[in-house]
Amino acid sequence: IKHCRQRFGVVLIDTPPSQSDLIAAAVDASSLVVLVTTPGPLDLDRMWETAKAIDRPSSVLLTQTRANTVALRDAERFLSDHGLARFDATIPFKEALRRSSESGRMPSASGYGLVANEPIEAFHGIE
């Protein structure tokens, strides 16, 4: 990771949600942790437990969102009430995005492009 950081300046590490050893190693190597969650109450509670356990700056990325819904407003309120930073953009729910793991193709309008610069800007703000 040090070599990559020297070469590229910023290194993003994506981990699967259920491999705690891998997640712990990635968090230990991180300057900024992106906590990814859906707006669902169970997912938010799980993410909150993770947020409390890490000792790094973090920001929450809401995925599978639907604009102008009670669920999204409740999730945003949850993050605010718990003092959690979040990305300005969210990743909208799209059926094609759900199926992308089967096809191996990411839809062009997935929404991830909207948040691409936010972690880099945040990273530079804490370094």
Predicted regions span which residues?
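Histidine-centered active-site loop/cap adjacent to the catalytic His
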Residues: 108-127
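Inter-motif core of Ras-like GTPase G domains
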Residues: 18-41
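Beta-strand-loop-alpha "switch" segments that mediate conformational coupling across diverse proteins
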Residues: 66, 76-108, 121
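Short histidine/acidic/glycine/proline-rich micro-motifs that form metal-
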Residues: 41, 63-68
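Short, well-ordered alpha-helix to beta-strand connector turns
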Residues: 8, 30-31, 83
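Structural beta-sheet core signal
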Residues: 13, 35, 60-62
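Anionic-ligand binding region
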Residues: 32-35, 42-58, 70-80
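Switch II (G3) loop of P-loop NTPases
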Residues: 1-23
